[in-house]
Regions:
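Extracytoplasmic/periplasmic proteins that interact with beta-lactams or build/remodel peptidoglycan
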Residues: 1-79, 93-123, 128, 293, ...
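Short hydrophobic alpha-helical segments used for membrane anchoring or interfacial signaling
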Residues: 80-85
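Short, gly/Ser/Thr-rich active-site loops of penicillin-recognizing serine hydrolases
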Residues: 285-292, 378-389
Length: 389
């Protein structure tokens, strides 16, 4: 019989082993059933007709950071992903609404049929959300690949832009005035990035998005493929929307965390992993996971330039609440509209210790408003806790 001492806190990432398996329970099932006990112990058990003790899995999860993230998200729906960009270690994975794995057998029928909360859905890996302005890292990368520089771009933001009878507004109709590329990114200017997107075109944006694993498989056991619909035939209004993270694009928080990990790790995405080590019943190490590179998503120079853009977001832009700390942060906020009334999910992606990145955080708060309102304070609590330890 399983006992989950943390109850709901790790419910999705650790998973369950009743009514099928999910999460780490599924990934580590064979390992937990396998025994590397000392051979004399196995002979003794065979003689006594007793079972050998299965191996123990040591996860990469950080219980303290998980608790901080879990409590910071509170009663709101959403997800938090925290990773170590240089290794691929998955340190935190929170998804809410959640469930108690200790009582999942008793509550199974209710949980399976609960379409309102979808508590069994791991929003961190399998949630599908419009990325909002976090997608501007993709648009920015495509611009750099096409132009070779961010210098020389100038735009006069008047609070809205209309092309082919389609109008896009900046958040709260803010008029940003004269901007270069860096200030447009820091201000999260929708008008400038809609203008940039139209200049790039659907085919170019699609190529760069797919380089960053949109419409592609991810190096995970369980995930939802992120979708990106632009192509060479896409109409201008859809390109405008897509370039600012709206349109038909859908992405998981984990996928945005992986893109951020690549930016923080000189362009290389390390293969994410949950199992740090396997030990036998005597505590001897059976297998230790060694970090391995999964794929280079961008050049070192491209990653460095995106990092500079994201640093400016914290220094003088929409994530300025994270500035002035004992450590540095680079990030991007997002407000992803999801209905006709203009309600939006609150996004943040970013990393700390900019010169030698140590921690990547991705946060989404459903119906949380702007990124700076809900997601940034959660990320701040996680960064603070990590750097205080």
């Amino acid at each position: 019989t399983r006992n989950y001492p943390y109850s709901n806190m790790f419910s999705h990432v650790v998973g369950y082993d009743t009514n099928g398996k999910s999460g780490l329970e599924s990934e580590a099932n064979f390992t937990l059933l396998t025994s590397h006990s000392f051979f004399l112990t196995q002979m003794k058990n065979q003689f006594l007709n007793e079972k050998n003790t299965g191996d123990t899995v040591v996860s990469t999860l950080n219980a303290n950071l998980q608790s901080i993230a879990y409590n910071a998200l509170g009663d709101r729906r959403g997800a938090v992903v925290v990773m170590e960009p240089s290794t691929g270690k998955r340190l935190v994975e929170v998804s809410k609404p959640d469930f108690d794995p200790n009582t999942i057998g008793d509550n199974w029928d209710y949980l399976v049929n609960d379409e309102n909360d979808s508590s069994l859905l791991n929003r961190a890996t399998n949630g599908a959300y419009p990325p909002g302005s976090t997608f501007k890292v993709v648009t920015a990368l495509d611009y750099f690949r096409k132009k070779g520089t961010f210098e020389g771009y100038n735009y006069l933001c008047e609070g809205s832009i209309t092309l082919q009878d389609h109008t896009i507004h900046c958040y709260h109709n803010t008029v940003h005035g004269q901007e270069n590329f860096y200030s447009a990114f820091a201000n999260s200017c929708n008008c400038a990035f809609a203008d940039i997107g139209v200049g790039l075109g659907g085919a170019s944006l699609r190529e760069t998005a797919e380089n960053l694993l949109f419409n592609k498989s991810l190096p995970l056991n369980s995930y939802r493929t992120s979708s990106f619909s632009l192509d060479a035939d896409s109409v201008t209004p859809l390109i405008m929307q897509t370039a600012i993270g709206q349109g038909n694009t859908l992405v998981s928080p984990m996928h945005m965390a992986l893109i951020t990990c690549a930016i923080a790790n000189d362009g290389v995405l390390m293969k994410p992993y949950l199992i740090d080590e396997v030990v036998n019943d005597n505590g001897d190490s059976v297998k230790k996971t060694e970090p391995v590179a999964y794929k280079r998503l961008m050049s070192s120079n491209e990653a460095n330039l995106l990092g500079k853009l994201m640093k400016q977001v914290v220094d003088s832009g929409t994530a300025s609440a994270l500035s002035g700390r004992s450590y540095t942060v680079a990030g991007k906020t997002g407000s992803a509209e999801f209905d006709e009334e203009g309600h939006s999910h609150s996004w943040f992606i970013g990393y700390s210790n900019v010169d030698d990145p140590d921690l990547v955080v991705a946060v989404i708060v459903e119906n949380g408003g702007s990124g700076s309102e809900a997601a940034v304070p959660i990320a701040g609590q996680i960064f603070d806790a990590y750097h205080a330890s």
